[in-house]
């Protein structure tokens, strides 16, 4: 019966991920992961045929363009100019999720990459059930329900980002590390290796698991040392691959696509971030989340210590990080939020049993069901189930460009640069990467190379474009667009300005 119930919970989350999935390559993160998945798939495909190819391909226009810092203007959303291959681009995001997506791309094309999301969501729920079952089978099942209903899980499982995959891998690593089976330390280390590849900055979580294995009280010292050493060796490949990849992409094993550590981290951020993360945790998961703090008294032991220490380490890693104001950045704590939810269920169950309350199973189950309903309601009040509709503009605009613009179109855009490349296969140029004095000359340059320039904006970007290029007639953007898509995206043809001034411009095409 519990197996059927768990399958139902897993299936519900998977269906949610598919039904409401915002499976578009549009934003910075999503295009970063999906585009790199295409590159890794290309590398794997060539290797399977006994050939070698590189992850970085130089863009000829970036090599030849005459304006300052030209490479930056040809780096689409989610990418930066490569410091190691002139004229190429590199992702800002870690390689782990893209590598996981690559086999799906090989099997079913670029859009198949999105199917890793429900799979990782299923792994997250299943692993939570296993870890929770260390406190009892009932706790395992009920905690998996809470995780599947968590607002931040629901918000992230429908997006092509690494948060749910990272959480799934860390929970699976904990599930294996807390197992009594002979090869559990080895398997936990291998999963940790994958988790590090997915989110390299969370290496300290792996150290926490290693210390748990080293200090596990129910085992002898030889067993502890053997388990910890096995775990450490199995975790090492992920660290090595990260170092090699980052060295190839950014010129150093310790560099990343997000920028310098000095720019990203400061102790001055700690207070602001502490209030934000704890506040978001409370507002999304109700005051019940505080019950996890009672676990050391009601459920003393290694598993409780592991869960709380991992959460504190996860929190500490992000306290000095850049301050964000949107609740969705609670996703940074997603790898360990399931551990808190397990402790919440375990504390309720243990408290009822300690006070010998009749009907413990029914009361605990009812409490968790109520919490789950509150969680889902909270997720609905946030834009969780509207993301698919809100981000559909990326796909619609990209498809329009592919269907209606000529093959030699070069699209000057910014936030839509990834979607134009992914759905239309057209070259892009970032207007906010151009020197303000170079817009007109950039248009002349791309025409001289055989490309027809188009301008594509989200409506909110038009004012910024005008302000950036006040000295250019094209920069005024004072003629109607050739097309408006989903009432949010506009496409302009620079040549249409003269037609408009002479009264010969055809009307704007409105695309729903």
Identify the meaning behind each predicted range.
Residues 1-9, 138-141, 190, 232-240, ...:
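Signature aromatic-anchored transmembrane alpha helix within multi-pass, membrane-resident enzymes
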Residues 2-4, 128-150, 167-168, 177, ...:
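Transmembrane-helix signature of polytopic, membrane-embedded enzymes
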Residues 28, 113-123, 142-172, 177, ...:
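Multi-pass, polyprenyl lipid-linked donor-dependent membrane glycosyltransferases
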Residues 33-34, 163, 198-200, 204, ...:
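Hydrophobic/aromatic-rich transmembrane helices and adjacent perimembrane loops
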Residues 42-97, 101-106, 265:
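Interfacial juxtamembrane loops and adjacent helix segments
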Residues 72, 76, 225-228, 243, ...:
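Membrane-lumen/periplasm interface segments of multi-pass, membrane-embedded glycan/lipid transferases
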Residues 123-129, 282-308, 347-350:
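Hydrophobic, aromatic-rich transmembrane alpha-helices
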Residues 370-419, 447, 511-512:
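Membrane-embedded, lumen/periplasm-facing catalytic core of multi-pass transferases
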């Amino acid at each position: 019966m519990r197996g059927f119930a768990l399958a139902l919970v897993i299936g519900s989350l998977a269906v949610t991920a598919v039904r409401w999935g915002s499976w578009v390559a549009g934003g910075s993160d999503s295009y970063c992961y999906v585009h790199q998945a295409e590159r890794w798939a290309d590398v794997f495909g060539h290797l399977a045929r006994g050939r070698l190819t590189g992850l970085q391909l130089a863009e000829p226009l970036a090599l030849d363009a005459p304006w300052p810092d030209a490479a930056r203007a040809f780096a689409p959303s989610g990418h930066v100019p490569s410091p190691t291959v002139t004229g190429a681009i590199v992702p800002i995001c870690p390689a782990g999720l893209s590598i996981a997506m690559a086999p799906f791309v090989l099997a079913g094309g670029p859009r198949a990459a999105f199917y890793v999301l429900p799979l990782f969501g299923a792994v997250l729920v299943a692993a939570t059930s296993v870890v929770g079952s260390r406190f009892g089978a009932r706790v395992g099942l009920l905690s998996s329900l809470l995780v599947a209903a968590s607002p931040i899980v629901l918000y992230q499982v429908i997006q092509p980002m690494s948060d749910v995959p990272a959480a799934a891998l860390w929970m699976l690593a904990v599930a294996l590390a807390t197992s009594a089976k002979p090869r559990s330390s080895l398997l936990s280390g291998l999963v940790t290796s994958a988790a590090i590849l997915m989110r390299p900055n969370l290496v300290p979580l792996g150290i926490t698991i290693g210390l748990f294995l080293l200090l596990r009280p129910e085992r002898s010292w030889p067993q502890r040392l053997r388990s910890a050493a096995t775990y450490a060796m199995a975790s090492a490949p992920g660290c090595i691959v990260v170092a090699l990849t980052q060295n190839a992409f950014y010129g150093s094993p310790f560099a990343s696509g997000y920028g310098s550590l000095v720019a990203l981290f400061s102790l001055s951020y700690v207070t602001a971030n502490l209030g934000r993360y704890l506040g978001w945790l409370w507002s999304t998961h109700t005051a019940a989340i505080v019950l996890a703090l009672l676990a050391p008294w009601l459920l003393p032991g290694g598993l409780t210590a592991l869960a709380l220490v991992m959460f504190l380490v996860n929190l500490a890693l992000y306290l000095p990080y850049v301050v964000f104001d949107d609740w969705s950045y609670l996703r940074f704590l997603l790898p360990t939020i399931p551990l808190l939810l397990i402790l919440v269920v375990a504390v309720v169950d243990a408290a009822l049993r300690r006070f010998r309350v009749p009907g413990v199973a029914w009361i605990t189950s009812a409490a968790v069901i109520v919490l789950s309903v509150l969680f889902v309601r909270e997720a609905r009040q946030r834009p969780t189930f509207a993301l698919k509709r809100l981000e559909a503009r990326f796909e619609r605009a990209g498809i329009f460009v592919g269907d209606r613009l000529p093959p030699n179109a070069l699209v000057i855009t910014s936030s839509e640069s990834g979607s134009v490349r992914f759905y239309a296969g057209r070259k892009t140029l970032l207007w906010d990467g151009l020197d303000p004095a170079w817009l007109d000359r950039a248009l002349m340059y791309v025409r001289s190379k055989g490309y027809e320039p188009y301008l594509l904006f989200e409506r909110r970007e038009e004012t910024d474009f005008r302000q950036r290029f006040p000295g250019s007639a094209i920069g005024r953007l004072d003629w109607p667009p050739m097309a408006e898509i989903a009432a949010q995206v506009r496409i302009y043809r620079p040549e249409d300005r003269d037609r408009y001034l002479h009264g010969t411009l055809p009307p704007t095409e409105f695309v729903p």
